[in-house]
Amino acid sequence: MTIDNPSAFLKTLPTGSGVYQMQDAQGKVIYVGKARNLQKRVSSYFRRQLDSKTQAMMAQVQSIQTTITRNENEALLLEASFIKQFRPRYNVLLRDDKSYPYLYLATHQKFPRLDFYRGAKKAPGRYFGPYPNAGSVRENLALIQKLFKLRQCSESFFKNRTRPCLQYQIKRCTAPCVGYVNEQEYRRQVEDAILFFEGKNDQVIIKLTERMEVASENLVFEEAAHYRDQIRQLRRLQKQQIITGGKGNIDIIGIAESNGAIGFAILFIRSGRMIGHKPFFPNTPLGTTLQTALVEFIPQYYLSPLRNGDIPERIVTSEPLEDRLWIQRALSSGLNRKLAITDQKRAPYKQWQAMAALNAAQALSQHLAQKNTFALKLEAIQKSLALPNPIARIECFDISHTLGEATVASCVVFGEEGPIKKDYRRFNISGVTPGDDYGALRQVLTRRYVRLKEGEGILPDVLLIDGGMGQLRQAAEVLEELQVSGVILTAIAKGPGRKAGLEKLFVWGRREEIHLPADNIAFHLIQQIRDEAHRFAITAHCNRRAKRRVESTLQEIEGIGPKRRQKLLKYFGGLQELQRASIEEIARVPGVSETLAKAIYDACHQHKG
């Protein structure tokens, strides 16, 4: 509803709970809010005394749309849904586009596998986490393997083993694949690992101590020594790890502000043990208070489907939380589970609140320093290349292949805060003459910018090509054909002897080359972006090339038909294991002579690397 006459408009508003949407002249939603009393809350925006942020917003508001809800809880849940849908510029917007990783234990298997997992929890078994990042998962996975020696391999690899793999040799697995441990003993390893995940280290130590004593009484000293080492490792770990007083799952949310920016840090406490922390830097309008940011952050974060249903029993905040009970009730209702929120600074959470706030301040400081550094470098590029407009986004393309084989193109994206890895793309090139870099470049640019024109992304301010004037001409022709305008086309070409620091720069529409000093910060960033595109392209190319060669290696061996090829792969559990095998080991496969084994060995090693 338009607000030409505010007094008349406000009288039409209901006095019950609901959600309101502020819209600008184009009908775009620029703010979403919730209210226990819609009339009273919306009326507050028409007072004379407003803060600068609200004044700036209200100057753009042309209409307000309201949605009535049955109760306050529904209002909070609907507000979070609308914020996610409309991404209003005056709301605190959480940018958290990645699901959280877990450790997954396939308890339904005879010999359960423990592995890294990310995604919807559809497979049967136990999930431990979530962890703040992949590094935390891998660190804990390595620890569990060291302590309890659970297998990590896939089912196909496991079922086709005839000898232990490297994990057994480095004492990270007990090799159930070849019967070195029976099902009962392996289940004990699994049970110990589960107790460890649940924070019941003392119970694990008691069990291991009992087994050690039994082994000693039976004079099985090697086994007793193994249990002794496990106990020592667990006790050492207990001293190193930070343990809370309780045994539950708690999220401690710290918040900090600096120069108008706001940052969060969440400490993840799982089964009484801190497993890591993760920082967040949402888009916050200038003038947003810590309390407002906290109120808008919490529902967005915990109602996101990326949480995968993993909600702690308690949330603790480092700052007072307005409408704490309202948010607590609404989240409990929306998530269909009991949830407590604590914002008082008292035992046993006081030290954790201080630690979370400290982590938030430190992360925000580093984030702003990096942001300022990249913003300055982008400004330096604009000045050094004499570009007409400021730069907020650069895309760089590179082509990688080996003599025309397995050609791959990469696209990396940099912005004011550095690399934007979620926008990186790789393209498998097909249908062009092998080794035709111009053809490959035309294909990747066409595919990329057709998608951008259709609204699948943001056009860059600058397009950077790893190449010279020839590549730049191809890019200009493609963008002209697609009628893409407003993008500055640049290229970086290798200098004499391909030495770093001697590169030449080109800008489309100018005849002269540009040479920047080796110590120029703009030049350094251009090199960094080019090198990142090259790294991303060559990694994708090597993976594609290796896959092709793996698929073709056995087909090239004379005398090996489909059945024998399958028998070899099944015997060794895969082509990589076959490549590691000696001639003697290959000759042990039924139906393979020593002569054929040598031919297989030679063919495998011909394609190594």
UniProtKB/Swiss-Prot annotation:
GO terms for biological process: nucleotide-excision repair; SOS response. InterPro entries: GIY-YIG_endonuc (IPR000305), GIY-YIG_endonuc_sf (IPR035901), GIY-YIG_UvrC_Cho (IPR047296), Hlx-hairpin-Hlx_DNA-bd_motif (IPR003583), RuvA_2-like (IPR010994), UVR_dom (IPR001943), UVR_dom_sf (IPR036876), UvrABC_protein_C (IPR050066). Pfam families: GIY-YIG (PF01541), HHH_5 (PF14520), UVR (PF02151), UvrC_RNaseH (PF22920), UvrC_RNaseH_dom (PF08459). The keyword DNA damage applies. It comes from Coxiella burnetii (strain CbuK_Q154). GO terms for molecular function: DNA binding; excinuclease ABC activity. The UvrABC repair system catalyzes the recognition and processing of DNA lesions. UvrC both incises the 5' and 3' sides of the lesion. The N-terminal half is responsible for the 3' incision and the C-terminal half is responsible for the 5' incision. The keyword Nucleotide-binding does not apply. This is UvrABC system protein C. GO terms for cellular component: cytoplasm; excinuclease repair complex.
